[in-house]
């Protein structure tokens, strides 16, 4: 039986170039960011074959960390991205999100 986790968060460290969202956004689940390599080890240990990455709220509308993981490991990760639907530039992004 294949196990697929339907909601997993990975995130990068907060930096000046990529600050976390403020206000109503949640805070990270733990003080150390969770990257895709660590997640793959955890998935393998738990017998999870694939997962859907959902960018966390504290990364606002950024999807880059999750998209990069899916690009590197397309057989393991898919992304349910976050888009600011009120922004016109988000429409252009929709055309690239086919897989």
Task: Locate each region found by the language model.
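Helix-coil boundary/capping segments in enzymes
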Residues: 1-99
């Amino acid at each position: 039986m294949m196990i697929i986790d339907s909601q997993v968060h990975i995130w990068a460290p907060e930096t000046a170039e990529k600050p976390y969202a403020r206000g109503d956004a949640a805070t990270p689940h733990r003080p150390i960011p969770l990257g895709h390599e660590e997640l793959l080890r955890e998935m393998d240990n738990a017998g999870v074959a694939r997962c859907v990455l959902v960018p966390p709220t504290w990364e606002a509308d950024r999807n880059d960390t999750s998209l990069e993981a899916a690009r590197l490991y397309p057989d393991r990760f898919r992304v349910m991205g976050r888009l600011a639907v009120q922004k016109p530039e988000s429409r252009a992004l929709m055309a690239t999100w086919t897989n």
